[in-house]
Structures are given as C-alpha cells and as structure tokens.
C-alpha cells in the first residue's frame, strides 16, 4: 500500500509557496504521493502542475476536482497538461461535489448525478488515451475531438464514488475510487467489492495525528470537521461504519495505534492511504509526518 498525505487543506499552509513546500517535505520524507483538494481556493489541477515542476519523484493527485463546473474536454486538456508538466506523475481525481454546492451555490442542476458521471467519463476517458471522441448523450455532445499534449501519457483517473451505483461506474469506466471519511470495515465490505474488479485503485483518505492527548485531539477534530458529518454522502459512510462523526473515523494515538489502524486499511484493500494530518497541537504535524516517513 502506498502512503501519501493531503496538502493545502489544514488552513495554515494555504499560500501557493506553502503548498509547494509541504509537497517538497512529503517527498523528502519518502512518501509516495500528495493529494490536493479542489474547494474554494487554488485550482488543484493547475497547482499540481506547478508542484510537479518543483518536485522530482512524488506522485500527485487531486482529491477531488468537481465535474459539474468543468466540461469533460476542458478537464481532460488541463489534466493532460499537468501530466506532462509533472513527467506523468499525476492522477486525476474527480467527483460530483455535493447537491448543496452545485444547486444552491452554483445554480446548476444536480439532477441524475450518476448519469452525469457516466456520460462525463465516457467523454473524458477516451480523451486521456489520445482517442478521437464522437459522443451524443443527454448531457454532453462531442464530435470529432482529440487532444494532442506532447509528453503526456494516459493518466490514472479515480472517482469519488461511495454509493453502489457510483462505485459500479467507477469500476467500469475509470481506474478506481478516491474516498474520504470511510472506515476500514466499510472499505472492506462495501467500497472495494462495489468496484467489481481486483485491479482497482482505492484511495482511502482519513484524518490522522500522532499524539498522547487523545481526548483533546478527538474534540478538536470533531469541531473542525463537523460539516463532513452533515453532508449526506459522508454521513452515509459514517453510519455504515457505525460511528457518530469524523472524530471517530480519525486515527489518533501513539505510534502503535497509528500503525495498527493504517494496517487495517491495507487489509481492507486500500491501495493508497491518504493521511490528512491534523495539526491539533504544536508539533503534531511534524511528528505525524515523521511517523509516516518511518513506515516507508
């Protein structure tokens, strides 16, 4: 199992230079990859193109970029450019986002999200392979389009798929799934089998911190990540795991605890562990990164 970390999502390291420096630290620590969320700050795909020019080895991925505001041909072109810029270390992670964002904030329709993702991938995936697309769907229509991005190989594409229909689509059309707030039991019994294939990429992202102040860390994480317990898709995963909130999914404790919990994700079928380090107290980020480095 590859071990990576989330960058640019802790609220402190939020300038472009900070994100680059954190990625460099992760690379120096020997981690396999870094993952960047696309929320309301820097564009994740563009940022990782820059990170790719400033690093040498570490894998780069979006976790994730929303599909609705971006035509699949546009995101394919942008992603292939980032693949070329990073010498093909880039993994494109895409997702639907959430109904409250797409409808209430962006004023777009969130009708038939699974159909949207199927059509999106049916346009996107051939473009990443250098093929010419001729496609007529209900939401997208593309004719005679091919992309030529020198230096860009076909990149892995993972979908933020949690429900059974989306998992089936991700397994059928993409390379796997990129998850967040999914516990090891749900991963083993629902996510991995739901993809329907043995060679799928399964990214498991969870909060993590190395600390002896367990109760304080749980309380802080619960407060800081409270919204993830309220969004329907994540709430469903927490309920499947039988836990109350994000603080119960988080991996918190000493080195033995962290090592054992990470092993549970590996045993569940996760191929890429995405450690979202929670800087809940002074020195927590550095300690946790050093611990993750020791596992390599």
Each PLM stretch: what is its role?
Residues 1-296:
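Active-site-adjacent structural elements that line small-molecule/cofactor binding pockets in enzymes
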């Amino acid at each position: 199992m590859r071990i990576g970390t989330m960058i640019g999502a802790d609220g402190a390291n939020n300038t472009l230079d900070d994100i680059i420096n954190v990625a460099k630290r992760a690379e120096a620590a020997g981690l396999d990859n870094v993952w960047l969320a696309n929320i309301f700050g820097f564009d994740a795909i563009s940022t990782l193109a820059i990170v790719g020019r400033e690093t040498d080895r570490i894998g780069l991925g979006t976790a994730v970029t929303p599909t609705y505001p971006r035509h699949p041909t546009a995101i394919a072109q942008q992603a292939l450019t980032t693949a070329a810029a990073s010498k093909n270390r880039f993994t494109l992670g895409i997702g639907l986002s959430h109904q409250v964002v797409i409808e209430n904030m962006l004023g777009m329709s969130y009708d038939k999200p699974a159909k949207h993702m199927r059509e999106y991938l049916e346009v996107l995936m051939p473009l990443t392979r250098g093929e010419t697309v001729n496609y007529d769907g209900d939401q997208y229509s593309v004719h005679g389009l091919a992309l030529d991005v020198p230096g860009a190989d076909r990149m892995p594409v993972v979908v933020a798929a949690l429900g059974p229909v989306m998992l089936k689509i991700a397994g059928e059309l993409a390379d796997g799934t990129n998850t967040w707030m999914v516990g090891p039991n749900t991963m083993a019994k629902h996510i991995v089998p739901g993809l329907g294939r043995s060679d799928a990429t399964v990214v498991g992202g969870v909060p993590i911190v190395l600390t002896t102040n367990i109760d304080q860390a749980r309380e802080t994480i619960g407060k800081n990540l409270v919204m993830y317990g309220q969004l329907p898709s994540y709430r469903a995963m927490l309920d499947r795991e039988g836990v109350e909130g994000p603080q119960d999914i988080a991996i918190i404790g000493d080195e033995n605890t962290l090592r054992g919990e990470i092993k549970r994700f590996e045993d569940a079928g996760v191929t890429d562990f995405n450690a979202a380090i929670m800087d809940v107290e002074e020195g927590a980020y550095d300690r946790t990164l050093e611990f993750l480095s020791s596992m390599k």
